[in-house]
Swiss-Prot record:
Pfam families: HGTP_anticodon, TGS, tRNA-synt_2b, tRNA_SAD. Its main location: cytoplasm. Its cofactor is Zn(2+). Residues 1-61 form the TGS domain. Belongs to the class-II aminoacyl-tRNA synthetase family. One of its GO terms (biological process) is threonyl-tRNA aminoacylation. Residues 242-533 are annotated as: Catalytic. It comes from Burkholderia lata (strain ATCC 17760 / DSM 23089 / LMG 22485 / NCIMB 9086 / R18194 / 383). This is Threonine--tRNA ligase.
Length: 635
């Protein structure tokens, strides 16, 4: 007798082992038809999986997130099936699920073209109509490797050799195609109805630039066409908002081959940067942080003591001088510990909060670089809090409050918070981890925040909180971090004198709100589609004269506004006013101030807000007050 507990708490009993599909059928024909897989004691399995013991089971359908993952994984295999039918000489490698879709890497003797993608997608649709059953079988390592070698699939054979001996080798087949996979997969290809191939890109075998370059075909798959259409529309909008395109259009920055992963900031872009940095500086100063500056290049011995030389050297830029090895800092924390150590610290000095807009460099792979979002040289709004164990909860509460306020001011209202908990390999005792994890929970609760817990995702030296902001397109970006560190203070010898005159290690909190300034500016540009709110905009206003006779008034008006702190410029070119308005509208300036003879004579200004909104003629003082109200409300 096999007892199956269902999600509603009911128990069904069967006289013999049953498959997931049979359980679904016993519940109802609708569920049997909708079943894509099952969650057996928490593990995703195929509908063909046999249950021969008492267990809990949830039937997975296309209404579940797991169901969508199964669909996407199966569509990746369908893609490989279609490619092999159309291009038999192509070799298949791997095809995982990714955010919003999947990809599959192929080795082929020529580049795939857009026309090839159309043919492949059409063939996939034909295979779906066949509704071929997907079958799974477990085979020996030798049998699997021998099979793939016999059909010339050397990459699959290599993958099999790298699979741990204890793992099962599963082969999935539909029609004339067989692939190596952990699964699970849909019961038949007819379940895969909504998909689209997106693009081809290059990729290295096993992600190593020393290996062969493969061709990666990206695709997306959904349960409903409406969802796919919405996603494709979002991609179109994202293309319009691409910060690289807007950076060029708005003359904010550029990047060039002579300095890969580094940014050349133009005057307007640097003005935007300065608004963000000055705002962040004001907020951390108000929160009791002390701003410091630490060296960019430090001796190898310090990086060895911190552990970075042993564990992070591949990502560090190094140099040598006078027979000494140095590294350009990839992060600021070791330098901050040096400042803390400089002089005897007492418990009365704590908490000490050190902030730095620290310039860091990391040797990212060239293929991973992406505009401002992934760079080699970047500045972090970094800070480290040194406190006692009794203070770390109150410090965490204060940081949560500060971070939420900052995100709101920048226009981000939806923040997802994730708490990463202890990994298997970790420093410190279970009791220490218990206190640390519960302390971070208590801090989040005190702020009225909700969070998702990620068991096993913490760093070996402590748990952390991540802050993921959602932009205008619903995309999630991890920006802020609050990381508790149980290791670095000890590694680098940080200590303070406690109230009983003993020497103790401080608790160290690594924290950032925006993270990489470059990346955050890229996110801001895309979130606002380049139309930065007035408090951030490089120019808040442009004064435009209609004719030469108003040029002097326009110039004096711009100078007067500048003295009042307005970021303003005057466009006195001898061009039609309609041309100038159109040009500055495309530059997304918040306010256009038009002056003609009437405005000059009355010492007023005609104000047009971004979006073509005519606010009419008003005294200059009224415009300044309106702008100041925008700034007060972060508009």
């Amino acid at each position: 007798m096999v007892s199956i507990r269902l999600p509603d708490g009911s128990v069904r009993q069967y006289e013999h082992p049953v498959t997931v599909a049979e359980v679904a059928a016993s519940i109802g024909p609708g569920l049997a038809k909708a079943a894509l897989g099952g969650k057996l004691d928490g593990e995703l399995v195929d509908t063909s999986a046999v249950i021969d013991r008492d267990a809990s089971l949830a039937i997975v359908t296309d209404k579940d997130a797991d169901g969508l993952d199964i669909i996407r994984h199966s569509t990746a295999h369908l893609l490989a099936y279609a490619v092999k039918e159309l291009y038999p000489d192509a070799q298949v490698t791997i095809g995982p699920v990714i955010d919003n879709g999947f990809y599959y890497d192929f080795s082929y003797n020529r580049p795939f073209t857009p026309e090839d993608l159309e043919k492949i997608e059409k063939r996939m649709q034909e295979l779906v109509k066949k509704d071929e059953p997907v079958t799974r079988r477990v085979v020996s390592r030798d049998e699997a490797a021998g099979y793939f070698r016999s059909i010339g699939e050397k990459y699959k054979a290599e993958i099999i050799e790298s699979i741990p001996q204890s793992d099962e080798i599963k082969l999935y087949s539909h029609g004339g195609f067989t692939d190596l996979c952990r699964g699970p997969h849909v019961p038949s290809t007819g379940k895969l109805k909504v998909f689209k191939l997106m693009k081809v890109a290059g990729a290295y075998w096993r992600g190593d630039s020393k290996n062969e370059q493969l061709q990666r075909i990206y695709g997306t798959a959904w349960t409903r066409k409406e969802d796919q259409d919405q996603y494709l529309h979002m991609l179109e909008e994202a293309e319009k908002r691409d910060h690289r395109k807007l950076g060029k259009q708005l003359d904010l920055f550029h990047m060039q081959e002579e300095s890969p992963g580094m940014v050349f900031w133009h005057p307007k872009g640097w003005a935007l940067w300065q608004q963000v940095e000055q705002y962040m500086r004001r907020r951390v100063n108000e929160a009791g942080y002390l701003e410091i500056k630490t060296p960019m290049i430090m001796d190898r011995s310090l990086w060895e003591a911190s552990g970075h030389w042993q564990n992070y050297r591949e990502n560090m830029f190094t140099t040598e001088s006078e027979k000494r090895d140095y590294a350009i800092k990839p992060m600021n924390c070791p330098g901050h510990v040096q400042v803390f150590k400089h002089g005897l610290r007492s418990y009365r000095d704590l908490p000490l909060r050190y902030a730095e807009f620290g310039s860091c460099h990391r040797n990212e792979a060239s293929g991973a670089l992406h505009g401002l979002m992934r760079v080699r040289g970047f500045v972090q709004d970094d800070a480290h809090i040194f406190c006692t164990e009794d203070q770390f909860i109150s410090e965490s509460i204060a940081f949560n409050t500060l971070a939420m306020s900052v995100y709101k001011d920048f226009g981000f209202d939806h923040i997802d918070i994730k708490l990463s908990l202890r990994p298997e390999q970790r420093a410190g005792t279970d009791e220490t981890w218990d206190r640390a994890e519960q302390g971070l929970r208590d801090a989040l609760t005190a702020c009225g925040l909700t969070w998702e817990e990620l068991p096993g995702e913490g760093a070996f030296y402590g748990p952390k909180i991540e802050y993921h902001i959602k932009d205008a397109l619903g995309r999630s970006w991890q920006c802020g971090t609050l990381q508790l560190d149980m290791v670095l203070p000890e590694r680098l010898g940080a200590e303070y004198v406690a109230d009983d005159s003993s020497r103790r290690r401080p608790v160290m909190l690594h924290r950032a709100i925006v993270g990489s300034m470059e990346r955050f500016l890229g996110i801001l540009i895309e979130h606002h589609a380049g139309a930065m709110p007035a408090w951030l905009a490089p120019f808040q206003a442009v004064v435009l004269n209609i004719a030469e006779s108003q040029a002097e008034y326009a110039q004096s008006l711009a100078q007067s506004l500048q003295k009042q702190g307005v970021r303003v410029t005057a466009d006195l070119r001898n061009e039609k006013i309609s041309y100038k308005i159109r040009e500055h509208t495309l530059e997304k300036v918040p306010y256009l101030l038009v002056v003609g003879d009437k405005e000059r004579d009355a010492q007023t200004v005609a104000v047009r807000a971004r979006g073509g909104v005519d606010l009419g003629v008003m005294p200059v003082e009224a415009f300044v007050e309106r702008l100041q109200e925008d700034l007060r409300s972060f508009k």
